[in-house]
Each structure stands twice: as structure tokens, then as C-alpha cells.
Amino acid sequence: VQEIGKYRQQGKLVTDPRLLQRVEVITERLVAQAVKMRPETAKWDWSVQVIDEPKTVNAWCMAGGRMAIYTGLIQKIDPTDDELAQVMAHEIAHALANHTAERMSVAMASQAGVLAAGILSDQPGQTMVLAATAAKLAVDLPNSRTAETEADRIGIELAAKAGFDPRAAVTLWQKMGAVGGGKAPPAFLSTHPTDAQRKDRLNALVPKMLPYYQSPGARPSHPVRIGGSA
């Protein structure tokens, strides 16, 4: 909420009606499926903003239903509607799976372990540095990667059930990899799966998701507040 307020004060909330309508139509279909998956989220205050930050290739969704996407992602990735749906479905999946709260719990647990190691050592400064590194490698990074993998799985299903082509999840990450220039830390030092790992896993999910996408019938929408009203 504070982040959105900051961007509003800076005049960085996009008001272009065509772009806002595009984002609104996509997110309303995704949210309808999110509510089917977790009915209690019907009470969330679902809203989405487009933030004018051309250098930021990012999007997010918080528990409670507040979403945002940055113009840098739209401009640099140039996503199709199906690909843009995969982005937002992935972020909605993080909120549905409560990953923000899980990350806070993991961070608190690893910090407690680091502090305990420092207290018990006769060289507390050096020990705490080593313990912090070990905690990041052993706890924080694997948990972050697990959350990303789970969000990929939930997100591609949400998007397929909302009528968006699951094959776009693969092409999206091909584009993401191209924008990133192929530069990434080793997998064991990354909070995200590598692009290759991600594409392989998504490719494996596509055949299971195609029936949802190809299923006949109307795709419902759920109201989402759009633009400067959030």
C-alpha cells in the first residue's frame, strides 16, 4: 500500500485506458479462477495498478489482492495476452500459496539460528558471518526456489483454466531469459530456478494444462479495481 502511495505521489500510475483495459480483462479472468481455487479470497480487495517504471521488469501480487505490473516488463518483454496472463497468474499464485508469510517465517528462523551461533562462539563476529552464509545456502535459497516452482505450477493452471494458452508460459520465460542476457548466478546461489530448469518444468506441465485451456465454455470474470482507484 505504501509502495502504491509513493508511485501515486510521483505521478507514476499509468492512466492509458487501452493498457489498463488490457490488464483489467486479463486479471479479472485470472482472479475468477483464484477465487474458485481459494473461495475465501472472494473477500480480498482485488486491485491492479500499472506502474510507469521503464527499467523495472517486474510484477507482484500481495495477499489481500493488491497487484501491480511495471511498464518495463511490458516494454522489454512485449508479451502477448497469453504471456502477460502467465506473469500475473504466477504472481497471484504466490499470494494464494501464502509465500510472503512463509518467506518471513523462514527469514526469522534463519536469523535466530545465526544469532544463536554467534552467542555460542568465542569468535562471534566471524562465526555469525559464516552462519549467515550457511543459512542462506541451506535454508533461504532452497525455500525461495521451492516457492517459485510452486507458483509456476499453480500459475500455469490458473491461466489455463482462465482460457490462456499454457504454452505461453514457456515462450514467456524464453523472452525473460533473452532480456536477462543469459546472465544468472549458479543454481545453488539463486532464489529462482534457472531459465532452463523453469522451461523444462513448464514444458512438462503443458500437456496436463492444455485440456483446461481447450475446454469449451465461457470464462468467468471477477471484479478487479483498476488504475488510480486503488
Task: Please place each PLM-identified region on the residue numbering.
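A Zn2+-metalloprotease active-site environment signal
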Residues: 1-230
